[in-house]
Amino acid sequence: MAGGGSDLSTRGLNGGVSQVANEMNHLPAHSQSLQRLFTEDQDVDEGLVYDTVFKHFKRHKLEISNAIKKTFPFLEGLRDRELITNKMFEDSEDSCRNLVPVQRVVYNVLSELEKTFNLSVLEALFSEVNMQEYPDLIHIYKSFKNAIQDKLSFQESDRKEREERPDIKLSLKQGEVPESPEARKESDQACGKMDTVDIANNSTLGKPKRKRRKKKGHGWSRMGTRTQKNNQQNDNSKADGQLVSSEKKANMNLKDLSKIRGRKRGKPGTHFTQSDRAPQKRVRSRASRKHKDETVDFQAPLLPVTCGGVKGILHKEKLEQGTLAKCIQTEDGKWFTPMEFEIKGGYARSKNWRLSVRCGGWPLRRLMEEGSLPNPPRIYYRNKKRILKSQNNSSVDPCMRNLDECEVCRDGGELFCCDTCSRVFHEDCHIPPVESEKTPWNCIFCRMKESPGSQQCCQESEVLERQMCPEEQLKCEFLLLKVYCCSESSFFAKIPYYYYIREACQGLKEPMWLDKIKKRLNEHGYPQVEGFVQDMRLIFQNHRASYKYKDFGQMGLRLEAEFEKDFKEVFAIQETNGNS
């Protein structure tokens, strides 16, 4: 967070500010359009510039973030130009005050800018103020300019090559006679071959090799010389003879193309080109169909399925119940869900059973798209008939609330619905993890309601000394889940950044975070309630001790206050003046 002068001095640049100023003299003025930001040519294709700089920006976000040592004036400039919102600006500043490294904050901002990238992003990034404040941006700016120039040079080289090549149709135009069907057919074949040679000269597997392209270009020039000589020899002939000779020359030139290429299609060493790829794809497609089983009746209620070397029978009716229904029966009589069948087949890493599991050689997703197979809902409702009564006595399906939102993380995905209330959870977001095999399954909110409502008030010291029996375990799990439901919990879920900073972590006790407590709790690693409460409070103690600014840390204070309030309510702790 040092000032601009100290940043320049620490860089160890020869000449210091004067060298930076000298570099700045060669940079474009901020008022110039981005089309001329990296090139002096006004006629450059702006689409080409955009595509090139976007890819370069995407690949060099890490270098850019490393060049920016402090947030001012980088973040302020983005906010003033309305490239980031005030909320993003404030969140970024808060993260820095919370000792999150500046480079990490800048990288996150660049990642957001990438999603809505436009050319004004680079105008702001390479503004005169930023270039003076962050000298390391100068060489990054030059890398953008070099990327543009290389792209333009490559395009210009290709354009000149095309101009130097003879026009295959020239001999036909000189004769001013319409093509016969045979000549047109041969001409089309020649054009296809010419395009193949052209593309092969320009790239090999998409990587340009200019030396090779130049060598090929010489071959085309020799052919052009021969064509011109042939044309000169026929200039003195009569009109009728010229018409005949022009057609013959066209056929001759078309046949010569295969000789110039030097290789026949299909032999080893042939370049992969756009002309070659199309028929190859069709051949592969036809070949792949040979492995499909055309005898399978996809409309049948039972379908044979495979995954790797495992075979089974898929029951459509069971699949309609949801992705967690055991709808596939293997040869040994065991039942599996689609995901379990995928794992048994050796495709656990795929995590996409719709593609891993096949029927008649086709992935199940293809059958679902064609309507031959039902697409099961992402949420598995064990009891679809359950209906709650609202205040106006109208029937309300409880699963209509938050169908696509986990109660804890507020995100979508594969969700599990409680059989008593309308809440849905990810399997691992719920504490303890959802028991998918248990029917009916009740979430922890419903289980807490079922527990005895009236409790005798007691001192906190008495609560902390309790053994972790099932009832106390349930209460601790509920407390932790309530913390995860708070938006502030995301910062404390993983190990905080300040544990990696030597100056910040000095004097701190054992590193502690929510996921670590969650793992211990799920493994029944706390013999007493005291151990759980101590770990929770340790998170907030370490957070307070790591503050750089006393007026900051509202995020941790709010979460701590919420936990203490819930702790007293759940365990019916009696308030005392000396209670912390």
Curated annotation (Swiss-Prot):
Skewed-composition ranges (Polar residues): 224-236
CDD domains found in the cross-reference section: Bromo_SP100C_like (cd05501), PHD_SP110_140 (cd15626)
Single GO cellular component term: nucleus
Zinc finger regions, PHD-type: 403-449
Residue span(s) of domain SAND: 293-374
Chain intervals with Basic and acidic residues compositional bias: 156-170
Start-end of Basic residues biased regions: 207-219, 280-290
Annotated Bromo domain residues: 467-570
Cleaved signal peptide residues: none
UniProt keywords, alphabetically: Bromodomain, DNA-binding, Isopeptide bond, Metal-binding, Phosphoprotein, Ubl conjugation, Zinc, Zinc-finger
GO biological process: regulation of transcription by RNA polymerase II
Cross-link entry Glycyl lysine isopeptide (Lys-Gly) (interchain with G-Cter in SUMO2), positions: 169, 292
GO MF terms held by the record: DNA binding; DNA-binding transcription factor activity, RNA polymerase II-specific; zinc ion binding
Phosphoserine: residues bearing it: 180
Cystine crosslinks: none
Chain ranges of the HSR domain: 33-149
PROSITE patterns: BROMODOMAIN_2, HSR, SAND, ZF_PHD_1, ZF_PHD_2
SUPFAM superfamilies assigned: Bromodomain, FYVE/PHD zinc finger, SAND domain-like
Name of the protein in question: Nuclear body protein SP140-like protein
Naturally occurring in which organism (per UniProt): Homo sapiens
